[in-house]
Amino acid sequence: MDSWSKNFELLIKSRTPLIWIRTKEEERLYKVIYQSCKKLNIRRLVSWDCVNGIKGVLNENGKFSNNPLGVLNWIKEQRSELPTILLVRDFHKFYDDPSISRTLKELSSLLRETKNNLILSSHILPSSEELDDLITIINLPLPDVSELTALIKKIAFNTCLLYTSPSPRD
């Protein structure tokens, strides 16, 4: 995973504006991006999905639920010096909408001039060839041995706690 994280961080540092990450592991992806944000001193990681809207920005939480165009326009308006990564989940459902395609084209050039990145996440690759040259597509690899070992240790530890803690009757 270290090599993947380094490559991802290089994409962020080089101001790659649009990155599509193919994965079914949304929470794991968020954690990996969060760790990269800490390393790169990016203080604002914002996520969006069509049910919950924006998460991670004070006074913005819940905005743009079921409005993918609204959230794309939101990142377009973020001009502050505070670097922002916007993680948009399940975007494949909206990708073929002409207004979404147009906005992604605009964001491709606009985000290069800011310290912001748009990360699109889905287990399905984009279907339109129209935007192929504008979006960098990468796959989140399966967990490596060290990640799996850490997960097994965590499960074992929690299981031990569960079975060794005193029962409420004691």
Language-model features: locations:
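Extended, compositionally biased accessory segments flanking or bridging domains
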Residues: 1-81
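Short acidic, S/G/P-rich loop/turn micro-motifs used as interaction or catalytic elements
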Residues: 26-28, 53-55, 91-98, 125-127
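Conserved AAA+ ATPase "sensor/coupling" helix adjacent to the nucleotide-binding pocket
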Residues: 150-161
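Conserved AAA+ ATPase "SRH/arginine-finger" region at the nucleotide-binding site
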Residues: 137-148
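Conserved small/polar residues in nucleotide/adenosyl-binding loops
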Residues: 163-170
